[in-house]
């Protein structure tokens, strides 16, 4: 059993998908999607810190989008910046960067296979991508 839950994040330019682990650290469940505005530096960090405290989170896993050649592009740099902003606001939190290549595509495919409507997919995709990111990390622990 974990002492603290683990949060998974899929950071985009307009939304942050959030998933959370069960207390055993076996499964990831979608929790929420934060609306952000990266251009205006409105990153939802205060809301995220509230979620971390409310759910007794000890570790945050942030998806790190890499290019297929393993280099880090613009979105990857944005995720690393998000990590720094979160650490400034909450220095005691452990943050793990997790290779998230293809997680959004996998989430989209699973929603398509579940026959979820296009409108509903748009609402769920970021949260589902966060679930894929966190589940990958949890699986690596066991």
From Swiss-Prot:
InterPro entries reported for this sequence: RNaseH-like_sf (IPR012337), YqgF (IPR005227), YqgF/RNaseH-like_dom (IPR006641), YqgF/RNaseH-like_dom_sf (IPR037027)
Localization terms from the record: Cytoplasm
Gene Ontology terms for molecular function: nuclease activity
One Pfam family this sequence matches: RuvX
Keyword Nuclease: yes
EC id: 3.1.-.-
Signal peptide extent: none
Assigned keywords, A-Z: Cytoplasm, Hydrolase, Nuclease, Ribosome biogenesis
Nuclease among keywords: yes
One GO biological process term: rRNA 5'-end processing
Domain of life: Bacteria
EC category: hydrolase
GO CC terms: cytosol
Biological function: Could be a nuclease involved in processing of the 5'-end of pre-16S rRNA.
HAMAP family hit by this protein: Nuclease_YqgF
Protein family (similarity comment): Belongs to the YqgF nuclease family.
Name of the protein described by the UniProt record: Putative pre-16S rRNA nuclease
Organism of this sequence: Staphylococcus aureus (strain bovine RF122 / ET3-1)
């Amino acid at each position: 059993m974990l002492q603290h839950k683990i949060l998974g994040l899929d950071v985009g330019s307009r939304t942050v998908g959030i998933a959370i682990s069960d207390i055993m650290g076996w499964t990831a469940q979608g929790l929420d999607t934060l609306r952000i505005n990266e251009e205006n530096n409105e990153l939802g960090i205060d809301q995220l810190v509230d979620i971390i405290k409310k759910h007794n989170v000890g570790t945050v896993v942030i998806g790190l989008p890499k290019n297929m050649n393993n280099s880090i592009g613009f979105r990857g740099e944005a995720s690393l910046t998000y990590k720094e902003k979160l650490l400034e606001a909450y220095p005691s939190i452990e943050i793990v960067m997790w290779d998230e290549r293809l997680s959004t595509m996998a989430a989209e495919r699973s929603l398509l296979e579940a026959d979820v409507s296009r409108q509903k997919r748009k609402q769920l995709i970021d949260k589902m991508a966060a679930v894929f990111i966190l589940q990958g990390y949890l699986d690596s622990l066991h």
